[in-house]
Amino acid sequence: MVKKFSFITIIISILIVLQFDKVDAESMSTKDAKVYFIAPSDGQTVHNPVKIVFGISGMKILPAGINEEHSGHHHLLIDLPVLPNLNQPIPSDKQHMHFGKGQTETIINLTEGEHTLQLLFADYIHIPHKPPLFSDKIKIIVKDHND
């Protein structure tokens, strides 16, 4: 009986400590932070492979998995009509490209035609900051090298 009581007391104590030791899991962005494209520019006609250069100010770029205040890494959103859920980790597929090593540029191939691009900056576990940091959406036109 005493062992059972002691075990229950320990468990309750741990739960109480954990409850009071909760840390706000939301990663905050700075007031002056801004995410933007350095290249290409909105409306630009490009050829494959397409070089895309990311810009950010007011935040620190770090690889995924490193939890530091006011930091994160870029995600490139391709041809998305709306932003993904900003309270969940950003999906990883061909329309949601992760740059979790802290990259600030990429070279990709896109099909010919018009495409939209948007940047979304997120924390160490791919969840957008509060408030979220996303670029303006830009349109580019990909042409064949023979055009």
Task: Please state what every model-predicted region is.
Residues I66-H74, F134:
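Short coil-to-beta strand junction motifs in C2/discoidin
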Residues Q44-M59:
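Contiguous beta-strand segments within globular domains
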Residues T111-H126, F134-I140:
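Internal, hydrophobic beta-strand segments that form the core of beta-sheet-rich folds
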Residues G55-I66, I127:
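Short amphipathic, basic-aromatic surface patches that mediate peripheral association
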